[in-house]
Design a protein with these regions (language model features):
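Periplasmic-binding protein-like
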Residues: 90-104, 121-131, 173-178, 229-239, ...
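Extracellular/periplasmic periplasmic-binding protein-like sensory domains
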Residues: 144, 246-317, 326-331, 383-409
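Extracytoplasmic "Venus flytrap"
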Residues: 27-52, 74-81, 102-103, 177-186, ...
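Solvent-exposed, acidic/polar segments of extracytosolic/periplasmic ligand-binding ectodomains
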Residues: 28, 348-410
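Signal peptide-proximal N-terminal region
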Residues: 24-25, 49-71, 196-201
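Gram-negative bacterial Sec-dependent N-terminal signal peptides
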Residues: 1-22
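Extracellular/periplasmic Venus flytrap/periplasmic-binding protein
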Residues: 82-85, 136-137, 145-253, 288-296
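Beta-alpha junction/loop-to-helix N-cap segments that form part of ligand/metal-binding clefts
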Residues: 27, 42-46, 61-138, 150, ...
């Protein structure tokens, strides 16, 4: 398995050669609408740093269009209503590129609002760049020409996760725990469907949804998991809802496996500590030991911010925008959106493609496991002495799932 992938710009350069530097020096404003406060605020703060860090890396000569990226975040307090107010404020200030990711309920509201705005305001169109919200509806029943997703959606992650789990013969009883909004509901739905198809002998012995970013003590949930006899937990929880969950598991003696999306995200590595070694897994488009240029950037990021870079979608957002703007020879959102469709290039995790039919990025995924950092996998998040080490790479075709999207194009 090849995990140390190098950045290769050749494919982007070939696609964009004639458009290179067509907008050289032009400033492109990007606004991210996500939480910076509250229990899930630390994740948003980390990602705000990430976008600012890579805005410098990918501005000017760092992208084939030669544009300058200017980035800021508006705190939406994880509220769809606050997000719509922030969207209006950004549009009124002339922003045409909106980023969001933390919370599919917010993403669905923004996608709908942006689509309606664009229909009513020709010439003032806005593009929605979704870096993390993984509800499959966003690229299926509720797909929009103006929405582009850079993370793998839940159907893709669960496809890869259960492909790995089906060969783990010690997994017999599974408990599914999630946040009570569209994301948690979809994780449970796809987990049950995929397990039934690939390992019908596995019993789903319990299922729970809890309020988003409100639970401070998960001990009662751990008690239910233990009482069910589950040897494995599947959860799409993120931020404090995952860090407090694994903390409660450690404190209350639960020794089963956890299959997660976000074990490497702010707060969870510290909550895990040296516990969970060999038992906590993460399915994602990256991990902490990708090698090559990514290692250099992560080291530089940690030196600058005393924090860990983990939202790799940030890099692909900048890569895709730069390539599409060069190809379109324009920063006009309509032309850029059309140029983004079907765009292929090599990123930190290999060749990726923005699928034209639904605007879902097709990409490799990795299963990694929590273990002690060593010479081969040295990066230690939150200075824990531990790391997420890759155990399986899934090529694009493995995790790719079909779409029902019937997209209306301009």
């Amino acid at each position: 398995m090849k995990f140390g992938l190098k950045f290769v710009a050749a494919s982007v350069a070939l696609v964009c050669a004639q458009g290179a530097f067509a907008q050289s020096g032009e400033t492109v404003k990007l606004v991210r609408i996500d939480p910076l406060t509250g229990l899930l605020g630390p994740v948003g703060v980390n990602q705000d740093k990430s976008y600012k860090f890579f805005a410098e890396k990918f501005s000017g000569a760092g992208n084939p269009a030669g544009v300058k990226f200017e980035f800021t975040t508006i705190d939406n307090k994880l509220s769809p209503t606050e997000s719509l107010n922030a969207l209006k404020a950004a549009i009124d200030q002339g922003v045409r590129y909106i980023i969001q990711g933390n919370g599919s309920s917010v993403a669905l509201a923004l996608s709908d609002a942006i689509t309606k705005h664009n229909e009513r305001n020709p010439g003032k169109e806005v593009i929605f760049l979704n870096d993390s919200a993984v509800d499959p509806d966003l690229t299926n029943s509720k797909c929009s020409f103006w929405h582009f997703r850079f993370d793998a959606d839940t159907s893709m992650k669960i496809e890869a996760m259960t492909t790995f789990m089906k060969d783990q013969k010690d997994i017999q009883k599974v408990y599914i725990l999630g946040q009570n909004y569209s994301h948690g509901v979809q994780v449970a739905k796809f987990a049950k469907e995929n397990l039934a198809r690939k390992r019908p002998d596995i019993q789903v012995v319990g299922e729970d949804l809890h309020p988003l970013a409100q639970v401070r003590d998960f001990a009662p949930y751990i008690a239910k998991i233990k009482a069910s006899g589950a040897d494995t937990v599947i959860t799409g929880n993120w931020g404090s809802d995952l860090s407090l969950l694994v903390k409660a598991a450690n404190e209350n003696g639960y020794t089963g496996k956890f299959f997660t999306y976000y074990a490497g995200v702010t707060g969870t590595p510290a909550a895990l500590g040296t516990n969970g070694a060999g038992r906590v897994y993460q399915i994602a488009y990256n991990h902490y030991n990708m090698g090559g240029q990514m290692d250099k950037w992560m080291t530089e990021f940690k030196t600058k911010y005393n924090d860990d870079f983990y939202t790799g979608s940030v890099i692909r957002v900048y890569q895709t925008l730069g390539a599409a703007m060069a190809k379109a020879k324009s920063t006009d959102p309509v032309k850029v959106a059309l140029a983004m469709e079907g765009l292929k290039f090599n990123s930190f995790n290999g060749e990726v493609e923005m699928r034209k039919t639904d605007h879902q990025l097709q990409q490799p995924l990795y299963m990694s496991v929590w273990q002690k950092a060593d010479k081969k996998y040295p990066y230690s998040p939150e200075n824990t002495g531990m790391t997420l080490a890759p155990v399986k790479e899934f090529a694009n075709y493995v995790s790719s799932t079909p779409t029902s999207c019937q997209m209306k194009r301009p």
